[in-house]
Structures are given as structure tokens and as C-alpha cells.
Regions:
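Conserved "landmark" site that anchors the functional core of diverse proteins
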Residues: 1-302
Length: 302
């Protein structure tokens, strides 16, 4: 069988508030108006795949706060759950988080509500086989590309099991911070629209994640960032990690499903390496921005 030949199926018993299929996303298509999408917490996504012997870019399930339940239909599966810490059970029996878990044929894997963080990643050995769109199986909520968000009763094909499982370092995995995160920020392409006082406010004040946040962006509440230029600008390309400031002066941090263009000035950019922290920040989480320099510690690239 080829890598894309279905080996088994799993059934979604409980989809939770929002469960989507995600992988590395669709980088490189911004010039066509297509955003990157992909798993918001890429390190957790990669670790979940590693634990079950998958390539790091294999598709996983990304849950949001409420978890998910799935049944192994026509053969056993090996799964792992990483990212947001959540209770894991197989047919009601406790199972491990951030470790390989065997799910027999007909059994139900239950990932409960997150107790630390927001998004859990469920990898299944072999990888999920949702349709490829522009080289990715990811759901993009803004554009509608990729598979629709999962519903109860949906079935997903799983590729055949890998021939061997790798040895994995059993070092404990840290739980996501659930009360305060600190994000590095670089000056943005429209920083000149803001005075020095606005930059000081951004990098010294504390913000809180608002309820309206989603895979498109983190909306932040806190001190207003006063600008010296116009409230809006002609639409221009937007990137992952951009801190856009609309007319109300409250920053919005673009995440994986962000729009390809934006019409408000971007005061700063959070580098890719820090965005997994933002992926696990739920409503009420405190956020601090730390001024950074391109090429400085922890800043590999944008």
C-alpha cells in the first residue's frame, strides 16, 4: 500500500466545540491570497506525531478546550495526545498524556476538556488521510480550504501503521502556561505610525486574551496604543505573528488562519518561535510583550 492508502478508519463520537484536521499548513501561497493555516502549536503537533512514529508533518486532530472522543472502527490504533493538558481515557480507563496509547478495535478514546492550555493534538499512528489541498490536509477556517470542522459521526481514514516505532526520550513534557505568557516582539513594518510611547506601552504593559479570540487571531484587551498616523491604511499583505492595531488601539495578534491582507498598521511582529505560546492562551490569559532584536536570542527567523 502507498502512504495515502487508507488502512483503517476512526469515527468521531464527540467532536467537542471545535476539532479540525491540521498539519504544517500551506506556506508559500500568500501571493495567491491563501494563508498558511496548519497547527497553531507546531511543537505539540510534532511531538504527538513523533510519539506514534509519524513524520513530523503528518495530519493530526487539533481540539479546542473541550476535547474529542473517537472510536477505532476496523482495527486497533496507537495514538498520542499532546499540547493542552487534558484527561485521557480508553473505554473509561485512564490513559497517559504525551505518550503512546493503544486503542483496541471498537474502543473509544476520550480526550476530556483542557485543564491547562487550549488546544490538544491527537496523532494517530500512520497519520490521517484527509484530502490534500495545495499540499496540505489542514482546515483553514477563514478561507474554507481543507476539510470542514469535524462533527459527531464523521469518519476519517488512517494510513497504515508505520513499520517500526522510534525510541522516544521519556523526559516529562511541560504543561502550557495558563495564566501568563511572554512573547518576543520585533518592530513592525508600520511602527512609524506609532510614537515611542506606544512602543513603551506595548512592551511594558500587560494585556489579556479576550473571548473573541480564535484560530484567526488573539484579540487583546489592555492599554490603548495611541498612533500618530491615520487609523487605517491601504490594504497590504499580512503575515503570521503580525500585531495589527485597529482604530480602537487594542492590538490583534494574527495566528495561522489570519487574512492574507490587512488595512490597519502593524506595530510589531511576534516571531514564529514564540507563537506556540499564543496558541495555548485562553480567554483571560495575561500577555506581556518583550522587545527583541532580529538575530537576538530565540529569534531565528520570521
Amino acid at each position: 500500500m502507498t502512504p495515502d492508502t487508507p488502512g483503517r478508519e476512526v469515527e468521531i463520537v464527540r467532536a467537542g466545540p471545535l476539532t479540525t484536521v491540521q498539519d504544517r499548513g500551506r506556506p508559500g501561497y500568500a501571493h495567491l491570497g491563501v494563508g498558511r493555516s496548519g497547527a497553531l502549536d507546531q511543537p505539540a503537533h510534532r511531538l504527538a506525531n513523533l510519539l506514534v512514529g509519524n513524520p513530523p508533518g503528518a495530519a493530526t486532530l487539533e481540539t479546542t478546550i473541550g476535547g474529542v472522543a473517537l472510536r477505532a472502527l476496523d482495527g486497533p490504533v496507537v495514538v498520542s495526545v499532546c499540547g493542552a493538558v487534558a484527561p485521557v481515557h480508553v473505554d473509561g480507563r485512564p490513559a497517559a498524556w504525551a505518550a503512546p496509547v493503544y486503542v483496541p478495535t471498537g474502543a473509544v478514546l476520550e480526550v476530556g476538556p483542557a485543564v491547562s492550555g487550549v488546544r490538544s493534538y491527537v496523532a494517530i499512528a500512520g497519520g490521517l488521510l484527509a484530502e490534500l489541498v495545495l499540499g496540505s490536509r489542514s482546515t483553514d477556517l477563514l478561507s474554507g480550504l481543507g476539510p470542514a470542522p469535524l462533527r459527531d459521526g464523521d469518519r476519517l481514514a488512517v494510513a497504515p501503521l508505520p513499520s517500526a516505532f522510534p525510541a522516544v526520550d521519556p523526559t516529562p513534557v511541560s504543561a502550557p502556561a495558563d495564566s501568563l505568557i511572554e512573547l518576543a516582539v520585533l518592530p513592525g513594518p508600520r511602527a512609524e505610525h506609532f510614537g515611542a510611547e506606544a512602543w513603551r506601552t506595548l512592551t511594558r504593559a500587560e494585556y489579556r486574551v479576550q473571548d473573541q479570540s480564535n484560530r484567526i487571531a488573539l484579540r487583546l484587551g489592555g492599554p490603548v496604543l495611541a498612533r500618530q498616523g491615520p487609523d487605517s491604511i491601504p490594504s497590504e499583505g499580512a503575515i503570521l505573528g503580525a500585531l495589527q492595531v485597529p482604530a480602537d488601539g487594542l492590538p490583534i495578534l494574527f495566528l495561522a488562519d489570519h487574512p492574507p491582507t490587512g488595512g490597519y498598521p502593524v506595530i510589531g511582529v511576534v516571531p514564529d518561535e514564540a507563537l506556540h505560546h499564543a496558541a495555548q492562551a485562553g480567554p483571560g490569559t495575561r500577555v506581556r510583550f518583550r522587545a527583541a532584536n532580529l538575530g537576538g536570542p530565540g529569534i531565528a527567523h520570521l
